[in-house]
C-alpha cells in the first residue's frame, strides 16, 4: 500500500517452494516475495534485483545470482551461524558475509535483526513468547526497506493494526508489529 500511496506502479510475485515441509534453513525450503515498484508503468518482471533482503543464509544463497552487481543486500546477520551456513551447503569455515569479493560486488548491509527485534520488544511486564517476537523480524526488515526507499511507514502500521488487531483478533501481535 505504501508504494501505491506514493503514486508508484507496482507488481508482486510470491515464490513458494514445491517442498511443503523442507528442513528449516535448507535451500529446498526457501520462499520469497518479489516486490517491484517504479514511477512509470511496469510491464515486465524486470531483469535483475536492485535490492534483496535475506533473512537467512539459505535465502541469501538461493537468490544472490539474481542481484545486479552493485545491488543492495540486507541480511539478518544473526542467522549466519556455522550451523545455518552448513545446512545450505557452504563449506566449513566459510561465511559469505566475510567474503571480500562479494563485499566489493554488492552493498551488503549486515543487520542483527533477530537481536534488535528481541531487544526492542522484550518487556518483563508482558507475557510474550520469543517465538512471537521473532515473527516480528519481517516487520523490522520492512521498516529498513521503507526507510531505504523513503517510504512513509504510517499507512503500513495502520494496516498491520487493522489486520492483526481487528481481523485476526490478536491485539498483542498487532502491538508487537507496529
Predicted feature locations:
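Active-site cofactor/cluster-binding pocket
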Residues: 1-178
Amino acid at each position: 500500500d505504501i508504494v501505491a500511496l506514493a503514486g508508484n506502479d507496482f507488481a508482486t510475485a510470491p515464490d513458494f517452494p514445491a517442498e511443503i515441509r523442507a528442513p528449516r534453513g535448507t535451500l529446498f525450503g526457501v520462499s520469497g516475495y518479489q516486490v517491484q515498484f517504479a514511477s512509470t508503468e511496469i510491464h515486465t518482471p524486470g531483469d535483475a534485483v536492485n535490492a534483496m533482503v535475506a533473512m537467512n543464509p539459505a535465502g541469501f544463497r538461493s537468490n544472490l545470482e539474481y542481484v545486479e552487481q552493485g545491488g543492495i543486500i540486507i541480511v539478518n546477520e544473526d542467522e549466519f551461524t556455522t550451523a545455518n551456513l552448513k545446512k545450505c551447503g557452504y563449506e566449513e569455515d566459510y561465511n559469505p558475509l566475510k567474503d571480500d569479493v562479494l563485499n566489493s560486488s554488492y552493498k551488503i548491509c549486515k543487520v542483527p535483526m533477530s537481536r534488535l527485534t528481541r531487544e526492542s520488544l522484550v518487556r518483563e511486564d508482558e507475557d510474550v513468547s520469543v517465538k512471537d517476537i521473532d515473527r516480528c523480524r519481517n516487520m523490522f526488515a520492512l521498516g529498513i526497506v521503507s526507510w531505504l526507499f523513503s517510504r512513509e511507514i504510517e499507512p503500513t502500521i495502520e494496516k498491520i493494526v487493522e489486520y492483526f488487531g481487528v481481523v485476526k483478533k490478536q491485539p498483542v501481535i498487532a502491538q508487537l508489529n507496529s
